[in-house]
Structures are given as structure tokens and as C-alpha cells.
Swiss-Prot record:
Keyword Membrane attached: no
Gene: rpsN
Subunit structure: Part of the 30S ribosomal subunit. Contacts proteins S3 and S10.
PANTHER family per record: 30S RIBOSOMAL PROTEIN S14 (PTHR19836), SMALL RIBOSOMAL SUBUNIT PROTEIN US14M (PTHR19836:SF19)
GO molecular function terms attached to this record: rRNA binding; structural constituent of ribosome
Single GO biological process annotation from the record: translation
Xref: Gene3D superfamilies: 1.10.287.1480
Family: Belongs to the universal ribosomal protein uS14 family.
Keywords: Ribonucleoprotein, Ribosomal protein, RNA-binding, rRNA-binding
Top-level lineage group: Bacteria
Name of the featured protein: Small ribosomal subunit protein uS14
Length: 101
């Protein structure tokens, strides 16, 4: 089980990403616009740098919904490998069965 502080930190990051998503997209559109002047693009780049560091989506880490474990995460199920295995053995995941050859 991950520390509660780490799980809360990830939730805080997710809120920041949602809060600043529109602003970031607007500034990035200006930066990548070839028709905009160099000064406008530079100003947009400076404003983008002024946004909180944690508002960038790449700062987020996928975590297991049950345990908060950051490694061994299966995005399709939203679970870590251990909890996914337990759920599969109980038959909680439809269509998933243990492989054997």
C-alpha cells in the first residue's frame, strides 16, 4: 500500500492538470503557430513557464486504484499487477483467464 501522502499528491496533480488544461492548450497553440510573430510566441512561452510545474500532464503517474502502487500498473484495468491477478482469480474481470500452453 502506497503512502497516503503520495496518493494525495497525485490527486492534487490531477486537479492542477484539469484546472490549467485550457490555458496550456491556448499557449501551446500560440507557440506552435507559424503565423504568429516571434515576440508573441516568446511571450506565450514565458507565460507557459509561469504556470505551475505540476499542471503539466507528463508529471502525473499512473497508480493502482486499490493500493496506490506506481509500478506494474495495467492501464486497461486501472489496477496494479497484484490486484489484477487477485481480481482475475476471483473471476471479477470478465473475459480474462489465466494463460496456459
Amino acid at each position: 500500500m502506497a503512502k497516503k501522502s503520495m496518493i494525495e499528491r497525485e490527486l492534487k496533480r490531477a486537479k492542477l492538470v484539469d484546472k490549467y488544461a485550457a490555458k496550456r492548450a491556448e499557449l501551446k497553440a500560440i507557440i506552435y503557430d507559424v503565423n504568429a510573430s516571434d515576440e508573441e510566441r516568446f511571450d506565450a512561452q514565458l507565460k507557459l513557464q509561469q504556470l505551475p510545474r505540476d499542471s503539466s500532464p507528463v508529471r502525473q503517474r499512473n497508480r493502482c486504484r486499490v493500493t496506490g502502487r506506481p509500478h506494474g500498473f495495467y492501464n486497461k484495468f486501472g489496477l496494479g499487477r497484484n490486484k489484477l491477478r487477485e481480481a482475475a482469480m476471483r473471476g471479477d474481470v470478465p473475459g480474462l483467464k489465466k494463460s496456459s500452453w
